[in-house]
């Protein structure tokens, strides 16, 4: 199982936290008693939740011990639990969450057709499911990863690393999953808000883009390679990124980063 490097992830903390804040800004809950940060990472999103819902029980869920260790140091007042999102449910005796907040995490989990309705059904009546997912698998950053991974010198080691991250569904499918009839009796959406944004991040260089991706998307491609081949992969990747992202008027590169946002509220 992959583990993550919190320090590498947080090199671009402002850029990573911005969509988390914009997702939270659209959550229509003035108060909450129990908030779950599903895929909390190093706690940058959890901090936003704790600031907005002071006094609430905040539970962070992640499958990375390294990320959880950083989150616990940063927010000792919150609860953090090692768990797999694919099978997570509230602990026995725990109150149903008023907010399940999943920022940049569900793209690593498959079978959204069943996952999303299951998470929605875990909410307390009137509760909110808030999701943000990168939608960049067809961007040059990710196409280039797969192209290089298919080269013979890398393919034997990388295998199916391109499948580690789930394909997200068409936007309308998420709307239908939440706005339509639910399997569990008594679970019905009162409102579903879905939108798509393409961020344009100014990056200092092609190397900076590579460093961003090393914190997330590149990891399953590079981690299984011998050390010498890791360097070869990253060199080839940077060369192709350099060719794909032209220099702008100020000498920087614009990194296009599409993201999908979903906010769905259960009827009381």
From Swiss-Prot:
Keyword Transport: no
InterPro entries: Methyltransf_25, SAM-dependent_MTases_sf, Trans-aconitate_MeTrfase, Trans_acon_MeTrfase_C
UniProt record, GO biological process: methylation
EC number: 2.1.1.144
Entry GO MF terms: trans-aconitate 2-methyltransferase activity
Top-tier EC class: transferase
Superkingdom as given in the UniProt entry: Bacteria
Cellular localisation: Cytoplasm
Keyword annotations: Cytoplasm, Methyltransferase, S-adenosyl-L-methionine, Transferase
HAMAP family, per the entry: Tran_acon_Me_trans
Function, in words: Catalyzes the S-adenosylmethionine monomethyl esterification of trans-aconitate.
Protein name as catalogued: Trans-aconitate 2-methyltransferase
Protein species of origin: Delftia acidovorans (strain DSM 14801 / SPH-1)
């Amino acid at each position: 199982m992959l583990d993550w490097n919190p320090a590498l992830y947080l090199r671009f903390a402002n850029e990573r936290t911005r969509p988390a804040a914009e997702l939270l800004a659209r959550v229509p809950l003035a108060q909450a008693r129990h908030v779950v940060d599903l895929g909390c990472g190093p706690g940058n999103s959890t901090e936003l939740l704790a600031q907005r819902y002071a006094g609430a029980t905040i539970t962070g869920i992640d499958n990375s011990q390294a990320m959880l260790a950083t989150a616990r140091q940063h927010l000792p007042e919150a609860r953090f639990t090692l768990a797999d999102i694919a099978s997570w449910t509230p602990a026995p005796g725990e109150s149903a969450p008023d907010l399940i907040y999943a920022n940049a995490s569900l793209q690593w989990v498959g079978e959204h057709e069943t996952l999303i309705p299951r998470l929605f059904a875990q909410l307390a009546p009137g509760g909110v499911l808030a999701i943000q997912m990168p939608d960049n698998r067809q961007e040059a950053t990710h196409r280039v990863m797969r192209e290089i991974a298919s080269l013979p010198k890398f393919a034997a080691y990388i295998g199916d690393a391109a499948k580690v991250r789930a394909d997200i569904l068409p936007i309308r499918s998420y709307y239908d999953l939440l706005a339509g009839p639910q399997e569990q009796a008594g679970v019905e959406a009162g409102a579903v808000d879905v939108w798509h944004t393409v961020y344009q991040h100014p990056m200092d260089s092609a190397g900076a883009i590579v460093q961003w991706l090393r914190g997330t998307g590149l990891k399953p491609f590079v981690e299984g390679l011998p050390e010498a081949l890791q360097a070869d992969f990253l060199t080839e990747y940077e060369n192709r990124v350099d060719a794909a992202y032209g220099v702008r008027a100020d000498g920087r590169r614009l990194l296009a980063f599409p993201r999908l946002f979903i906010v769905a509220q259960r009827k009381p």
